[in-house]
């Protein structure tokens, strides 16, 4: 399934897993280790693109991840994070120890939160060293949860988007497939489900419907009426 559908909702609260409320950001970006980036992302190139991404947060890897979404099915997500949402402001992204928010969140990969009109995405610190391409795919999923509502249809679409974007990333940047990282394991699992379903959401939908974490979700939510 090629995901060309543009969802009209703006980025919001229900993320893949959970929520939080507060955050702070340093003025200068945090540098990361070279293995995270494709070769084109030299220090000079990153310095060049930083002004376009610095408002999302302090970690340089987010700038690279968002830039890697260019020429993928994740462009809508990229644009939403950069400010094409109801708040008309960039979504703030941060690595967090999620257990400090709630012990139940310790193993979660990502959280989303809407506080007033401000929008946030938090990524588990265990993924801080993951390849930027895997973080890009995760962000493509997160950016589809755009209000306080969630549903099985919405999760199915978001997981499928993540798989499609990861597939695109590997075509553009095959060096992103560093299997020693848990986030890459996650992305490859989704990619296999996508391939098994002949690039439809068939098996991803089955995984969503069987996920105990989603057992109380309604079938549909605004903007997601096809399951």
Report the location of each language-model feature.
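Auxiliary, metal-adjacent structural segments of Zn-dependent hydrolase domains
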Residues: 28, 33, 37, 41-120, ...
């Amino acid at each position: 399934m090629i995901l060309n559908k543009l969802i009209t909702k703006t980025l919001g609260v229900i993320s893949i897993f959970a929520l939080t409320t507060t955050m702070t950001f340093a003025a200068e970006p945090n540098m990361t280790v070279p293995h995270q980036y494709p070769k084109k992302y030299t220090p000079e190139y990153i310095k060049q693109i930083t002004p376009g991404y610095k408002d999302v947060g302090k970690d340089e890897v987010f700038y690279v991840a968002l830039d890697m979404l260019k020429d993928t099915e994740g462009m809508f997500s990229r644009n939403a994070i950069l400010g094409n949402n109801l708040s008309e402001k960039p979504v703030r992204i941060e690595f967090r120890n999620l257990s400090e928010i709630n012990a139940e969140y310790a193993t979660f990969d990502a959280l989303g939160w809407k506080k007033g009109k401000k929008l946030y995405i938090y990524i588990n610190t265990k993924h801080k060293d993951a390849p930027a391409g895997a973080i890009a795919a995760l962000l493509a999923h997160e950016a589809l949860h755009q209000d306080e509502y969630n549903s099985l249809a919405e999760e199915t679409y978001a997981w499928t988007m993540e798989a499609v974007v990861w597939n695109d990333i590997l075509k553009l940047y095959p060096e992103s497939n560093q299997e020693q990282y848990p986030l890459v394991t996650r992305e490859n699992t989704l990619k296999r489900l996508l391939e098994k379903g002949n690039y439809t959401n068939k098996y991803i939908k089955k995984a969503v419907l069987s996920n105990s974490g989603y057992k109380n979700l309604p079938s549909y939510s605004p903007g997601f009426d096809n399951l």
